[in-house]
Amino acid sequence: MAFADRLLAAWYAGHPALALLRPLEALYRRVVTRKRARFLRGDSASYRAPVPVIVVGNITVGGTGKTPMILWLIEHCRQQGLKVGVVSRGYGARPPRLPWRVQADQPADEAGDEPLLIVQRTGVPLMIDPDRARAVQALLASEPLDLILCDDGMQHYRLARDLELVLIDAARGLGNGRCLPAGPLREPADRLREADAVLFNGASEDRTEGFGFRLQPSALVNVRTGERRALDHFPAGQRLHAVAGIGNPQRFFNTLLGLNWQPVPHPFADHAQFSARSLAFSPPLPLVMTEKDAVKCRAFAADDWWYLAVEAQPTPAFSAWFDNQLQRLLRKP
């Protein structure tokens, strides 16, 4: 297990040795708290877009189901007749220049795995740039839009936001409740009180602290050809290699177990780069991966490589709440 994986496991298990990192945690908390305070006071300038900006992010390190929720929000807004754009940091991407408009036929190392997935699934206009404010300006200059979804960027306060949605893994929660590097929190836990909504991935019902949503498997898709198959394509008890280069690989492996398959788990670092050699496992079995990983593997995929398509399913209460927020944000003065 890599050091980063061991540290992540310790954060969520509450390992006592992490107490040694508390002096560094105190320094980190001071830095992030002061940074946010400067923007709140107006000492540091924020860019406010002429259209509503909705930030979808988290305050923890590790996967929370953010990309599937972004996909749900895009489709839901489109059903209201809205033109939606997305901005993203483009973690791991190496574009020719910044900001960079992501197209569906671009290589993953140029566009970034998550932005490429979003564009391939939805065709939404999407701009990547670590400077989210600059990305929003470039996106609005390229075409008229009704609102912007910011993929992550909770801590990027140079971009003013009209709505904040924070996602949390329902099973792992906030881990030991400590900030980096003594815990998984990017900001102190009380930051949640300032968000407009908290969504718990893996909760089928709403909680006092926020709304629930689940990731529902919908199909198997062949990585090489794009052919879709029903989930019963593999019989119960099917052994298969399971690949996950995401923030919380175990959640993916548990999903496969819940489908009555027998996965041989192969966890990779989040945003890992793959090759045919790195995915050559023994014994020869079908291989199932996440959709985020699949966008990086199509060029060398074997015939029996598949990805599991999943759809975010928030509770009806969140859908109703979000519709009310859209009406408020888009109300003409």
UniProtKB/Swiss-Prot annotation:
Domain of life: Bacteria
GO molecular function: ATP binding; tetraacyldisaccharide 4'-kinase activity
Any one biological process term the GO annotation gives: lipopolysaccharide core region biosynthetic process
Biological or metabolic pathway of the protein: Glycolipid biosynthesis; lipid IV(A) biosynthesis; lipid IV(A) from (3R)-3-hydroxytetradecanoyl-[acyl-carrier-protein] and UDP-N-acetyl-alpha-D-glucosamine: step 6/6
GO cellular component, one term: plasma membrane
Keywords of this entry: ATP-binding, Kinase, Lipid A biosynthesis, Lipid biosynthesis, Lipid metabolism, Nucleotide-binding, Transferase
Enzyme nomenclature, EC number: 2.7.1.130
Chain coiled-coil ranges: none
Catalytic activities: a lipid A disaccharide + ATP = a lipid IVA + ADP + H(+)
InterPro entries linked to this entry: LpxK, P-loop_NTPase
Binding, ATP: 60-67
Function of the protein: Transfers the gamma-phosphate of ATP to the 4'-position of a tetraacyldisaccharide 1-phosphate intermediate (termed DS-1-P) to form tetraacyldisaccharide 1,4'-bis-phosphate (lipid IVA).
UniProt similarity note: Belongs to the LpxK family.
Protein name stated in the entry: Tetraacyldisaccharide 4'-kinase
Organism the protein comes from: Pseudomonas putida (strain ATCC 700007 / DSM 6899 / JCM 31910 / BCRC 17059 / LMG 24140 / F1)
